Amino acid sequence: MIRSLRIRLMLGAAALAVLFMLALLPALQRAFGIALENTIEQRLAADVATLVSAARVEKGRLVMPEHLPVEEFNLPEAKVLGYIYDQNGDLLWRSTSAADESINYTPRYDGRGNEFHTTRDAKGEEFFVFDVEIDLLRGKQAAYSIVTMQSVSEFESLLKGFREQLYLWLGGALLVLLGLLWLGLTWGFRAMRGLSSELDQIESGERESLSEEHPRELLRLTHSLNRLLRSEHKQRERYRHSLGDLAHSLKTPLAVLQGVGDQLAEEPGNREQVRVLQGQIERMSQQIGYQLQRASLRKSGLVRHREQLAPLVETLCDALDKVYRDKRVSLQRDFSPSFSVPVERGALLELLGNLLENAYRLCLGRVRVGARLGPGYSELWVEDDGPGVPAEQRARIIRRGERADTQHPGQGIGLAVALDIIESYDGELSLDDSELGGACFRIRFATV
């Protein structure tokens, strides 16, 4: 399926132009053929008039001069032939040009006066015929039939030459027409390219709305998109502010509960209750932090940023190397230094931070970060040489809130945030075996 609107219109216009030319071609050929036949008829009629003016009847006999005014009648190889027949159909005279021709022609004498048609000689060659019934004896009806002929081959030669020339003319006209159509469509689609460029600038964060300098037919679309952008921005801000207000409103009750827990901890009999209370307080704090992260890291509707991968990996790994200095982790980078990911910086930091922290925590000593660009997508992965994940547990681990490591305390919030980020960017997360021997978290984002 052709997805380019300009190419669709161009192909449609080209098809119509070709069909028009194909319909025009036989019409022009027919018109030229008719015009050429009329010209030949008029020429033969003029030649008949020449013969009539030259003919005389003396003592009941037809007399013709030896040299006629039309030179073609006097040349043996000429294409114009002249004949005169009596009313019985007997040949009385033929021109010098017709001396070598063997045409068995019989006048019709049907009272029409003159007639234009075709006939053939003994060899099968076709001739145009102009036959005039005329009274040269002043009073006797149709005493003679004066006939002029011309070979059809000359007509066919002219028609063939015109046909070849017509092909060239129409072919050239078609190419010029297609070129003009292409230029017209290119000029007409400049507005669409301008709109596309502005959308690219919005996706990259270079501008916040579409301009008003577009054709009238596109203004409704641009106004609707601008309203959508403003509405999405306001809704996003309200969402962030609401969650921020909620978090701040819960801080004081949590602080009070923490203080009560500290007071209860001073009494030996309340230690178990205090432990449960503090665990729930910590869980509530983590959930609040998780929701705040979701609010701040979700992708904007139309804005699509690209962030360089190498600097972020360097920053995160420098920090993790200090935290896990005892492991002496060896980091391998399997991507181009210029590789970029279609994710905002904050979201990408959070996403990679969670995956790299898991890899550093569970590895034996080797971690690898890789990325590549595929047809229509960007893919990156984080893998380690740790214990890996059994195949039957992988689906559970990549579900929100499930934890890959149950040996250490936590709520699985980090991976849940990572999943939220991936889903907000229409991405996919998969868990495979690593070539290093451990687990490989693979993420794929669409780039179109």
Curated annotation (Swiss-Prot):
Cite the Histidine kinase domain residue spans from the record. 245-448
User: Pfam families from the entry?
Assistant: HATPase_c (PF02518), HisKA (PF00512)
Q: Which residues cross the membrane?
A: 169-189
Signal sequence extent = 1-33
Q: Which InterPro entries match?
A: HAMP_dom, HATPase_C_sf, His_kinase_dom, HisK_dim/P_dom, HisK_dim/P_sf, Sig_transdc_His_kin-like_C, TCS_sensor_his_kinase
Carrying Phosphohistidine, the residues are H248
Question: Catalytic activity annotated for this protein?
Answer: ATP + protein L-histidine = ADP + protein N-phospho-L-histidine
| Annotated GO MF terms | ATP binding; phosphorelay sensor kinase activity
Protein's GO biological process = phosphorelay signal transduction system
Localization recorded for this chain is: Membrane
**What are the HAMP domain coordinates in residue numbering?**
186-237
Keyword match Ubl conjugation: no
Record EC number: 2.7.13.3
Entry keyword set: ATP-binding, Kinase, Membrane, Nucleotide-binding, Phosphoprotein, Signal, Transferase, Transmembrane, Transmembrane helix, Two-component regulatory system
**Which GO cellular component terms, listed alphabetically, does the Swiss-Prot or TrEMBL entry include?**
plasma membrane
Q: What happens when the gene is disrupted?
A: Deletion mutant displays significantly lower virulence than the wild-type strain. Also exhibits a constitutive polymyxin B resistance.
Membrane-topology annotation of the record: Single-pass membrane protein
Described function:
Member of the two-component regulatory system PhoP/PhoQ that plays a role in the regulation of resistance towards polymyxin B and cationic antimicrobial peptides in response to limiting concentrations of Mg(2+). May function as a membrane-associated protein kinase that phosphorylates PhoP in response to environmental signals leading to activation of specific gene promoters.
PANTHER family, per this entry?
A: SENSOR HISTIDINE KINASE YKOH, SENSOR PROTEIN PHOQ
- By what name is this protein known? Two-component sensor PhoQ
Per the UniProt record, the lineage of the source organism begins with: Bacteria, Pseudomonadati, Pseudomonadota, Gammaproteobacteria, Pseudomonadales
Identify the gene encoding this protein.
phoQ
